[in-house]
Amino acid sequence: MEKNLTTGSVFKAILTFALPYLLSYFLQTLYGMADLYITGRFCGVDSITAVANGSQVMHMLTVIIVGLAMGSTVIIGHAVGAGNMRDAEAAIGNTVTLFMAVSLGFTAVLVAAVRPLVGLIGVPAEAVPGTVQYLTICFIGIPFITAYNIIGSIFRGLGDSKSPMYFIAVACAANIALDILFIGPMALGPVGAALGTTLSQTLSVIVALFGIRRHKTGLRLSRQNFRPRKGVLGRILKIGLPVAVQDGCIQVAFIIITIIANHRGLIDSAAVGIVEKIISAMFIVPSSMLATVSALSSQNLGAGKPERAAQTLKYAAMIATGYGIAVVLVIELVAEPLLGCFTTDATVVLMGCQYIRGYIVDTIFAGIHFSFTGYFAACGKSYIGFLHNIIAIVLVRVPGSYLASRLFAGTLLPMGLAAPAGSLLSVIICVAAYRWMKRRGTLYTAA
């Protein structure tokens, strides 16, 4: 399953790696949206709000885990690019050990804190019971959710984006089937949505483990690889921690924005929750470019080919920008019927259309700074991604959303525009940092 990405056409390598990841991301987004869509078909606005708020919290947890795993992807990629499979095996073994410990810790803390957490995010009173039920079930399943995401990160470090696609396809199909069963005939509401998500990812992990045993990976993992090694864990955390904190802060910003929407009432809360799900689907290419640039650049830097790594960044940013412009034009035309797929409430559709027409512009700028973030991580400088995101959140995204909510009580459009404004600032910082370090010759350092 290991694949070398350091030779041949850079553009072709991007497409070869990115297309399976694109499909994987689409499938993962699809099963995430299935919870909200099926809940909207069978339940009321209170259940929609519960699932929207609960899934927002779970998405935050997931991106923190995936962000931390970026360290594993990069370290494995460096080892594969350099042809050192022993280092790759050590990185994989220590990744498994680290993340199983992290997942058990998350489970213990979050199950105990679920009610205070729901109170903290300001869920409307009507949706509190459903949100608590949803999160309790999902928190119990954190070890399986972690394993599900870590398996994909390891394979991408090996240059294999196809195998995770198959595992995600299993989870997607299972989640949709279970959601229909649990939320429809069994009328379990948010509980059914949580069960569908957790059980489907558990099934995917089981399938992945069987798949790994049946295919030749070129790796020989031993018990020694799973013993914690300070040097290996240090390299993983050096890259992964800034990305995890960065992604966590981004999700905190989203939750703060959700809290702002919650305080505007049930209708606006439901509208923002639905749009967040749609936006996550629209981010399929920006997110794919982040993963693609980090994996390809890691292998190329490990192989001593920094020029190919820079070309990867260039092509990825161009692809993401073109995609973003196309998505903006399409959403402006189909916003109403798209929102109507998730709810029959005309007022929720109206407010959601206002929000998404401002928010969707973010796909243009996010694609660029996502590409830079992946590149900086591959260069061993993931702290730059952390810094530009924190600055954008603190100076623009959160205060912009708050002020827009206070100044424009009758519309969600200005709130939606806060996101692309923050991403534009991130792009400016990324370009400036890249040019400055390139002139100084300090871009490429060992991870």
Question: Which residues does each PLM region occupy?
Answer:
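Small-residue-rich hydrophobic transmembrane alpha-helices
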Residues: I48-A108, I145-P164, T258, A271-L329, ...
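Short alpha-helical transmembrane segments in multi-pass integral membrane proteins
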Residues: M1-A18, I76-P143, P185-L241, S297-D362, ...
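Helix-terminus/linker motif at the lipid-water interface of multi-pass membrane proteins
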Residues: L30-T49, V118-A125, L181-L188, G248-A281, ...
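Short runs within selected transmembrane alpha-helices of multi-pass transporters and secretion channels
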Residues: C138-R156, P164-C172, A193-A208, S287-L290, ...
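Signature of the first transmembrane helix
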Residues: K12-T73, G77, L241-A261
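Small-residue hotspots at the loop-to-helix junctions and early N-terminal turns
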Residues: C43-Q56, L135, A194, L266-A281, ...
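Transmembrane helical elements of multi-pass membrane transporters/channels
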Residues: T16-G32, I137, A171, S200-S204, ...
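Transmembrane alpha-helix boundary and packing residues in multipass membrane permease domains
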Residues: Y21, Y25, Y37, V74, ...
